[in-house]
């Protein structure tokens, strides 16, 4: 109780106390699942926006109050949701085709839709087939919309005007990119990289600009439906705002003053990765962002709050300092001086917190300076607690008791970048044995049903305000709902380029989940 009382005092003195008052500090429980991983009987090859509606129904049926998803920004042909070509636009790949009006007027639409729906029955997402099929469908569908004069509808015109800051550059970027057969920006000729040619390109690609803008309008409308349904059901949607953007993105092309392309961001060597990681993502020009009062960042949050009540602030320490790799492969922190990085992080966060009605939850895993953690807490920004990693690393290495977690946090047993609980138990037997001992459980080489259920139950009883686990860790309570190969239950292996990354598909459909009485009763008993 003293921990919670302290957190309540911090909240009431923070710039986001009004947001906190809306969410409240009672314990919250949720499920995290990538949108690309879910499917219904209507899904066309990949999880679609409106699939989130029955997903919300299932979550609330089981007693959860939060549905967390990974980023849903447009990633072009890339499967990683953290490597987007736009910081704001949604990914048209997730448009629910079956809900589009006049879809049946697309030539061979029935056959195309059936083919795409069959792809949803595969054990993994097949981007190589889904992306070209959906792109072809959308081209034909747009022609139908034009013939119906739908692009002159006042709602679409209002959307284009309201979102012109990001929408017009994005639509032009996509048009040029398609014209150049999706070449990366560093292979574009000066005609396309020199922004003085923009008015010329706007004329040349006018029809394509309208096409890409209309797709974004459809994405917006579908996600607004999802948000409306979530509000009706009392479910909070937690989005994910990647801190960085691809070098091959609209933002780096058009808002280039906010980025430095000569160096790239990554993570330093640490306990989990001896060599560190180079993410090959551009570093921000913080001086220019600050001069513009972080307008670019505020626009991202403004649009996202159409859909989300909470958001995961990816790699939140990056707002304070980044690990930067130069062209020779040498790494350093930028900025290095504690006063400089604390001033920088506190300044940008103060602006962002005041600019949004969403509650941020920081991803503060890895090497985080104590003073950064203290700064985040003083602003009432939650951190992330992964029990298997929550240990006294500076001292005995003992696990931190669950009732000693800072209430301003989310407890999660696994992340999209880690192994699932069962896979970790299998791959790290020494750690698993210590963890079982810490919890007072009998150790078994393979994670038993009893231990699995008890660990899940305990994860919902930590002193964190939020408790959100990957859907994979819940489904593992019923072996018929997961793959027989535990490696296929992993979403991503950081630092690797693999055909197994970002292709995870939930084995049962949402309809099957909703009808699975054994699983649903087990989940309802966890909290």
From Swiss-Prot:
Gene3D superfamilies: Glycosidases
GO biological process, one term: carbohydrate metabolic process
GO CC terms: cytoplasm
Transmembrane segments: none
EC number of the protein: 2.4.1.25
Single GO MF descriptor: 4-alpha-glucanotransferase activity
Compartment(s) where it occurs, according to its Swiss-Prot or TrEMBL record: Cytoplasm
Reaction equation(s) it catalyzes: Transfers a segment of a (1->4)-alpha-D-glucan to a new position in an acceptor, which may be glucose or a (1->4)-alpha-D-glucan
Record keywords: Carbohydrate metabolism, Cytoplasm, Glycosyltransferase, Transferase
Origin superkingdom: Bacteria
Chief localisation class: cytoplasm
InterPro entries per the UniProt record, alphabetical: Glyco_hydro_77, Glycoside_hydrolase_SF
NCBIfam families in the record: PRK14508.1-4 (NF011081)
Family of the protein in this entry: Belongs to the disproportionating enzyme family.
Identification of the protein by name: 4-alpha-glucanotransferase
Gene name of the encoded protein: malQ
């Amino acid at each position: 109780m003293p921990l919670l009382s302290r957190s309540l005092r911090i909240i009431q003195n923070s710039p986001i106390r009004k947001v906190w008052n809306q969410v409240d500090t009672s314990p919250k429980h949720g499920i995290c699942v990538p949108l690309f991983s879910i499917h219904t009987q209507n899904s066309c090859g990949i999880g679609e926006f409106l699939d989130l509606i029955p997903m919300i129904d299932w979550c609330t049926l089981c007693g959860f109050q939060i549905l967390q998803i990974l980023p849903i920004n447009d990633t072009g042909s890339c499967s990683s949701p953290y490597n987007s070509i736009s910081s704001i636009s949604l990914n048209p790949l997730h448009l629910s085709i079956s809900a589009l009006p006049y879809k049946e007027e697309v030539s061979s639409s029935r056959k195309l839709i059936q083919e795409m729906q069959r792809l949803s029955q595969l054990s993994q997402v097949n981007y190589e087939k889904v992306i070209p099929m959906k792109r072809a469908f959308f081209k034909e569908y747009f022609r139908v919309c034009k013939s119906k004069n739908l692009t002159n509808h006042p709602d679409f015109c209002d959307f284009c005007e309201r979102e012109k800051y990001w929408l017009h550059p994005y639509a032009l970027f996509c048009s040029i990119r398609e014209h150049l057969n999706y070449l990366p920006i560093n292979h574009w000729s000066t005609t396309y990289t020199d922004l003085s040619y923009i008015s010329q390109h706007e004329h040349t690609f006018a029809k394509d600009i309208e096409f890409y803008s209309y797709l974004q309008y459809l994405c917006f409308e579908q996600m607004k439906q999802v948000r409306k349904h979530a509000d009706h059901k009392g479910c909070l949607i937690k989005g994910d705002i990647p801190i960085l953007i691809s070098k091959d993105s609209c933002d780096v092309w058009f808002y280039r003053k906010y980025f430095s392309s000569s160096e790239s961001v990554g993570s330093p060597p640490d306990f989990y990765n001896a060599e560190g990681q180079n993410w090959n993502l551009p570093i921000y020009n913080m001086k220019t962002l600050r001069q513009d009062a972080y307008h670019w960042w505020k626009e991202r949050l403004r649009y996202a709050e159409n859909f989300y009540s909470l958001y995961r602030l990816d790699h939140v320490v990056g707002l304070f300092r980044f690990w930067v790799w130069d062209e020779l492969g040498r790494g350093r922190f930028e900025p290095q001086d504690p006063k400089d990085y604390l001033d920088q992080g506190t300044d940008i966060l103060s602006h962002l917190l005041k600019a949004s009605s969403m509650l941020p939850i920081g991803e503060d895993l890895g090497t985080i300076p104590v003073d950064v953690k203290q700064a985040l807490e003083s602003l009432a920004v939650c951190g992330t607690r992964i029990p298997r990693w929550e240990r006294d690393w500076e001292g005995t290495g003992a696990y931190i008791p669950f009732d000693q977690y800072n209430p301003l946090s989310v407890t999660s047993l696994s992340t999209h970048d880690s192994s699932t609980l069962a896979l970790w138990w299998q791959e790290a037997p020494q750690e698993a044995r210590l963890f079982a001992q810490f919890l007072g459980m009998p150790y078994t080489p393979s994670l038993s049903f009893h231990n699995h259920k008890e660990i899940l139950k305990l994860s919902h009883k930590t002193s964190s305000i939020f408790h959100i686990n990957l859907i994979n860790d819940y489904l593992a309570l019923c072996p018929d709902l997961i793959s027989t190969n535990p490696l296929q239950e992993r979403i991503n292996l950081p630092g690797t380029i693999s055909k197994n990354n970002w292709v995870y598909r939930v084995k049962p459909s949402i309809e099957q989940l909703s009808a699975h009485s054994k699983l649903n009763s087990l989940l309802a008993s966890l909290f």
